[in-house]
Amino acid sequence: MVEKEISGRFSIRFATPNDIPIILQLIKELAKYENLLHMVVADEKLLDEWLFQKKVVEVIIGEMNNTVVGFSLFFYNFSTFLGKPGIYIEDVYVKKEYRHQGYGKGFFRFIAQLARERGCGRMEWSVLDWN
């Protein structure tokens, strides 16, 4: 699964190194939304290292009519009880002007399908209690 059209002109694709500036911008927008912008120390070099050199985490980008509407960042964990890996979703962020239109659900569906395809035993995430 490299790219998937979710509905109409909304598609989700895996990020590439060319996306690093937009990923960082989206991370900062998310942090601002959560009133945590002061805590962001990530920069383009760190994102390149961990996303594309060491491949510890993955990012997917959602686009509507070739315009970025949001992103999700996730990584593997492992369940000793299941004896299988799982996927932990660290972030799902949809830009303000695109919220409440189903794009967030699209990210979750994409990752759930990916988890099934990769033989994962579960998919997990947590949400701030005020969100």
PLM segments and residue spans:
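Conserved GNAT-fold acetyl-CoA-binding loop/helix
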Residues: 24-49
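A short beta-loop-alpha structural element at the N-terminal edge
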Residues: 11-23
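Conserved GNAT acetyl-CoA-binding A-motif
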Residues: 116-127
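Conserved acetyl-CoA binding element of GNAT-fold acetyltransferases
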Residues: 84-96
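Conserved acetyl-CoA pyrophosphate-binding loop and the N-cap/start of the following alpha-helix
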Residues: 98, 102-110
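A short helix-loop-beta-strand connector motif used in the catalytic cores of GNAT acetyltransferases and
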Residues: 49-61
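Active-site acidic-Proline motif in GNAT/NAT acetyltransferases
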Residues: 95-97, 101, 129-130
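Conserved beta-strand in the GNAT
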Residues: 61, 67-75
